[in-house]
């Protein structure tokens, strides 16, 4: 059963909204009447979003591109849904992760949310309305130590950060 969210006129940013969970989120939001801007590193052949920006969210510059696109295409934002995440770290647990792998995990799974929230939340506070959703992982509580230590730690940090915004 699909609930009626009545998102008519709501402006939404969905990170990583071109495939998988993100694409499904964009589709649902559009069905509920929202105006949606989404991101990915590369523009897809087709998108259900109203606007798209190609940006590498693991970088400050990529996050800044998204903030600029939100202002240009949406004039601000009412809802932010952070779907971006994943891991390319090697298996082998803690011992297999060097400084570079740890930084990559944080750059993908934690810092984009912090950077985008920091830039867009003041506008939501000014309009006294808004919602931020951070998609994390069960691994924030139940990590797979032999394969996803950095990912799990970054998602746990994202969950703690999210609670701090409440």
Walk through the language-model features, giving the residues of each.
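Substrate-binding pocket helix/loop in short-chain dehydrogenase/reductase
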Residues: 91-94, 98-103, 132
């Amino acid at each position: 059963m699909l609930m009626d969210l009545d998102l008519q006129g709501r402006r939404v940013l969905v990170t990583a909204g071109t495939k998988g969970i993100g694409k499904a989120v964009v589709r649902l939001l559009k069905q509920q009447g929202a105006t949606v801007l989404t991101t990915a590193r590369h523009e897809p052949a087709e998108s259900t979003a109203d606007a798209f920006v190609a940006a590498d969210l693991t970088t400050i510059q990529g996050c800044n591109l998204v903030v600029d696109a939100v202002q240009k295409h949406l004039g601000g934002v009412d809802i932010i849904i952070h779907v971006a995440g994943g891991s390319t770290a090697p298996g082998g647990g803690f011992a297999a992760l060097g400084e570079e792998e740890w930084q990559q995990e944080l750059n993908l799974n934690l810092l984009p949310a912090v950077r985008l929230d920091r830039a867009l939340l003041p506008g939501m506070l000014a309009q006294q309305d808004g919602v931020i959703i951070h998609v994390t992982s069960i691994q924030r509580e139940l990590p797979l130590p032999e394969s996803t230590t950095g990912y799990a730690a970054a998602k746990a940090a994202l969950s703690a950060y999210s609670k701090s915004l409440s």
